[in-house]
Amino acid sequence: MEHSGILASLILIAVLPQGSPFKIQVTEYEDKVFVTCNTSVMHLDGTVEGWFAKNKTLNLGKGVLDPRGIYLCNGTEQLAKVVSSVQVHYRMCQNCVELDSGTMAGVIFIDLIATLLLALGVYCFAGHETGRPSGAAEVQALLKNEQLYQPLRDREDTQYSRLGGNWPRNKKS
């Protein structure tokens, strides 16, 4: 039993550490993006701007222009059939604002100033009456409550009962 456990661990030790013999790096220098491989890089799909260092470094262009594509790292003489690939998808936020404490303080400060100016404007326009008050407002203030309404006479409760009472009516037959 002990020998089978040792044999299983030797198999795992031999199989697991076998990774890719290639070292693919995606780096950003200044404002450009580069794909670098320790053997040679091959372009399959996407953006390419230029090659450097005997096809070991590939310039993808400016990071602001969102470079993307699939790139292969070719095998060496010993491992000719082995290839390793990397997919690059760069997405830059061109319309973003960095939200730090200074920006937040500025937003809050400007918000308070705008609120105060709005309150001042409402106070100035609503607080003062322009012109003189209307004559109807003065007359109503002088009348007593019982004089506001005229009582109905002779049970004539329709609105237009007294208008044109003596006038002859035109009836067409």
Curated annotation (Swiss-Prot):
Superkingdom per UniProt: Eukaryota
Intrachain S-S bonds: C37-C73
Keywords: Adaptive immunity, Disulfide bond, Glycoprotein, Immunity, Membrane, Phosphoprotein, Receptor, Signal, Transmembrane, Transmembrane helix
Glycosylation sites: N38, N55, N74
PROSITE patterns associated with the record: ITAM_1
Domain ITAM: 138-166
Membrane topology listed for this record: Single-pass type I membrane protein
Positions where Phosphotyrosine occurs in the chain: Y149, Y160
Keyword Membrane: yes
Spans through the membrane: 106-126
Post-translational modification: Phosphorylated on Tyr residues after T-cell receptor triggering by LCK in association with CD4/CD8.
Gene Ontology biological-process annotations: adaptive immune response; cell surface receptor signaling pathway; positive thymic T cell selection; protein-containing complex assembly; T cell activation
Signal peptide extent: 1-21
Residues in compartment: Cytoplasmic: 127-173
GO function terms (MF aspect): identical protein binding; transmembrane signaling receptor activity
Outcome of gene disruption: Thymocyte development in mice lacking CD3D is arrested at the double-positive stage with markedly diminished TCR expression. Thymocytes are defective in the induction of ERK pathway upon TCR engagement, whereas activation of other MAP kinases is unaffected.
UniProt cross-references to SMART domains, sorted A to Z: ITAM
GO cellular component terms, semicolon-separated: alpha-beta T cell receptor complex; T cell receptor complex
PANTHER family, alphabetized: T-CELL SURFACE GLYCOPROTEIN CD3 DELTA CHAIN, T-CELL SURFACE GLYCOPROTEIN CD3 GAMMA CHAIN / DELTA CHAIN
Function of the protein: Part of the TCR-CD3 complex present on T-lymphocyte cell surface that plays an essential role in adaptive immune response. When antigen presenting cells (APCs) activate T-cell receptor (TCR), TCR-mediated signals are transmitted across the cell membrane by the CD3 chains CD3D, CD3E, CD3G and CD3Z. All CD3 chains contain immunoreceptor tyrosine-based activation motifs (ITAMs) in their cytoplasmic domain. Upon TCR engagement, these motifs become phosphorylated by Src family protein tyrosine kinases LCK and FYN, resulting in the activation of downstream signaling pathways.
Official protein name in the record: T-cell surface glycoprotein CD3 delta chain
Gene of this entry: Cd3d
